[in-house]
Amino acid sequence: GGPAAYSTYTNTADFGAVGATLESTSKGLGGLNTITQFSKAVDSPTSSVRISNSRVSNDYGSLGYGALPAPAGLAYGAAGASYGASLHGAGAYGVVRAAPAIAAAPALAYGARAIAAPAIAAPALAYGARAIAAPALAYGRGLAYGGAYGAALAAPALAYGARAYAAPALALGARAYAAPAIAAAPALAYGARAYAAPAI
């Protein structure tokens, strides 16, 4: 409330004295963080008086210090790197940031980042072997030896690890050996190395 800045200047009422009074107030956004200065100088035939006062209020700072009671259902987590597997193959690196699930009032933090959003773990970008459902395309090593590009003609393969193999694979370039697929059934691979045998 009020104006952002104002100043007053007043002369003394006594004709025998010479003096002045100055008051200045500057306010921040929303009337917070005020700077108030007051000075008074009076010179009379018998005395000389100088008074100066300066006040600064940092209203935002009081919100970030001290222990605040946490409302029920409020969860905090530290930001960190997570390593996990994804639909696309090898480990997925990402950053998971946990934030309050329920915010009762605005919170301001100094030093660490605060994100006011529910913490939801989403699939992270992964680098490694690709596995796409029906047909599964794989890049990496074939069933036997050597790197190969291949198109799986059998069932979809879902890879949850470093390496996943779907049979059969059509090799383009390097040597790759694959057993023929007889029936179409989904091959699920979980782990560092998993091999999908032909489904009969």
From Swiss-Prot:
Entry keyword set: Cuticle, Repeat
Q: Tell me where on the tree of life, at the top rank, the source sits.
A: Eukaryota
Q: Name one Pfam family in it.
A: Cuticle_3
* InterPro entries assigned to the protein according to its UniProt record, in alphabetical order: Cuticle_C1
Which spans of this chain does UniProt mark as sequence repeats?
A: 98-101, 104-107, 116-119, 121-124, 133-136, 154-157, 166-169, 178-181, 184-187, 196-199
| Keyword field contains Repeat | yes
Q: Which PANTHER family match?
A: AGAP000382-PA, LARVAL/PUPAL CUTICLE PROTEIN H1C-LIKE PROTEIN-RELATED
| Domain notes for this protein | The tetrapeptide (A-A-P-[AV]) repeats found throughout the protein are also present in many proteins constituting the protective envelope of other species.
Record-given protein name = Cuticle protein 21.3
What are the top taxonomic ranks of the organism?
Eukaryota, Metazoa, Ecdysozoa, Arthropoda, Hexapoda
